[in-house]
Amino acid sequence: MRAPRGEEDPVSVIAYVLIQTEVGKAAQVAAEVAKIQGVVSAEDVTGPYDVIVRAEAGSVDDLGKMVVSRVQLIEGITRTLTCPVVNL
């Protein structure tokens, strides 16, 4: 699932957002997160996290705003962990 991105938005930061949800809410949460601009993919997974999101943003600040003001407000999410990609 991929949300639309404007061509004018440069990508400087890529991150994975690991999401824990209420029981039985993973598919619903993944579908809602996938609608957010900057989200490249949102997949249900098994293990300690229920949904893993790949997101792109123009800066670390923009990424933080996306997670705090958009992702974390979705009903059914109990916890998030944001992991920025680094090139070593």
Which residues fall in each region the model found?
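A compositional/biophysical signature of low hydrophobicity enriched in polar/charged and small residues
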Residues: 1-88
